[in-house]
Regions:
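Short beta-strand/loop motifs in extracellular/secreted proteins, especially
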Residues: 73, 87-91, 150
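Extracellular Ig-like/FN3 beta-sandwich strand-entry sites
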Residues: 70-72, 86, 134-138
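Extracellular carbohydrate recognition and processing domains
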Residues: 98-137, 144-152
């Protein structure tokens, strides 16, 4: 689906596992986070959507694993600050290297205000050690409020499975 077309992005996206939060947070690892009433205001997933994920200032939300290769370059989502006035939302990729070590790579920081806004496209495959077309990696998306500066809501997490255009 061209979920972000209204924002000038004509790429095709697929919903990340449980990324709309309408049926709960199945597969997500939540600490200080929960599914709540209220959905992003653009309704890109569906007009009837009514839920999102609230992440407390001291919380963290980690998505189910997503398989990434060079044909899955970006992901996007909606976010808004729900409390606090200065805190940012750090967005990271959690992945394992060839030695089995877990790594986290910051791919973006959200500084939006108290209204729902679409994130910019954030890198998936370009920040991972994927040098060959046939290489894949399993990654998790980590949403982590920085420095306890405020709580956040996220919704409609999408992965670009086809590349640009």
């Amino acid at each position: 689906t061209k979920a972000f077309k209204a924002f000038g992005d004509s790429a095709n996206y697929s919903l990340a596992p449980s990324g709309a939060f309408e049926a709960g947070s199945g597969g997500w690892s939540l600490s200080g986070a929960s599914v709540v009433a209220g959905s992003e205001s653009y309704k890109v997933h569906g007009a009837g959507d009514a839920k999102s994920l609230a992440v407390a200032a001291t919380g963290t939300a980690v998505s189910p694993a997503v398989c990434v290769d060079v044909t899955r370059p970006t992901f996007r989502f909606f976010a808004k600050r729900t409390s606090g006035t200065w805190g940012n939302l750090a967005v990271k990729l959690r992945w394992k290297d060839s030695s089995g070590n877990t790594n986290e790579t910051v791919v973006g920081t959200i500084e939006t205000g108290t209204s729902w806004a679409a994130s910019a496209p954030m890198s998936l495959s370009s920040v991972l050690p994927l040098w060959n077309v046939d290489q894949t990696a399993s990654v998790q998306l980590v949403f982590d409020p920085e420095n306890y500066g405020g709580s956040w809501a996220i919704d409609d997490v999408y992965v670009d499975p086809y590349g640009r255009g």
